[in-house]
From Swiss-Prot:
Residues 1-41, 104-121, 185-220, 294-313 are extracellular. It comes from Mus musculus. GO terms for molecular function: bombesin receptor activity. Disulfide bonds join 120-203. This is Bombesin receptor subtype-3.
Amino acid sequence: MSQRQSQSPNQTLISITNDTETSSSVVSNDTTHKGWTGDNSPGIEALCAIYITYAGIISVGILGNAILIKVFFKTKSMQTVPNIFITSLAFGDLLLLLTCVPVDATHYLAEGWLFGKVGCKVLSFIRLTSVGVSVFTLTILSADRYKAVVKPLERQPPNAILKTCAKAGGIWIVSMIFALPEAIFSNVYTFQDPNRNVTFESCNSYPISERLLQEIHSLLCFLVFYIIPLSIISVYYSLIARTLYKSTLNIPTEEQSHARKQIESRKRIAKTVLVLVALFALCWLPNHLLYLYHSFTYESYANHSDVPFVIIIFSRVLAFSNSCVNPFALYWLSKTFQQHFKAQLCCLKAEQPEPPLGDIPLNNLTVMGRVPATGSAHVSEISVTLFSGSSAKKGEDKV
């Protein structure tokens, strides 16, 4: 039996949810000690492919999220309620890409934990904060889109942007509170591998020997950062689907074209948020399942043939990929963001795209024409009031 197959369970922490930055993962120790033997063991080609993939995730993710943030702060028309949440998502993704992903990449070549006790606690805190910001922001976004679809013509309050910023800040605070126990209890533990008579250090949230703690930790992570938020999102989108189905029987007439476009705009944004939620669910599911499997099959997991190396790497890469896909999903779904993204990517000054009709405030509409007697241009300003005196909301739903 190869060394890879006979390693102790102390070296089997492979979950990003629990051990994104831990050095006791199978891949890191086996790479360092050249313990990968057998027909299906990765060689130098596999390591090169892994590092190229990690470098691609980091580079593409930083570029995409940085452009998204820049577009938001430089373009006044993009500073809307849903875009505030999406920009907060981008900050969380950048945090993960700049810290936890590079640290995880060191596991494949480095011997032991390289970043000390303080680094262990700080990186554990950052990792869980970033995951919390992602899933909790998507949950709040779904609630916001439900409200927008149910009441599509409701007037935006004057302090809507300020309240949304406060909500985004609250999400960060809640995520930090959930991540605080991880930082407090994470520590660097020293282990000995009897098969190779060597010791190594690992950053973990609990002692490896505590099986019950591992099971509780994996279940809590799965529930708090996956099942519960996605269940809430599913409820909101079920209500959105029901509302949209009913609204097809009561669509505004052509004479109310502004109302029609406003409703269609909000439907489109609801679909955009749903795509972001689906990407999160897809990217993080394998990692959560693998961590649960590891936690509840502690003894049998010592035989690593149960989980092929490619599946371990796939789950890690897929989870990290979620931090770089959102800007490109927006590029695909939003023509407005696509124009700004192209301009920033080409280092050109972004031209302001013309807002759709649904984003033009109709309470202050300028009309230009010619006075027949003089032939000169004449500008008159008229006030248009629709929907019981409520004016349209400017740019609220632009993405």
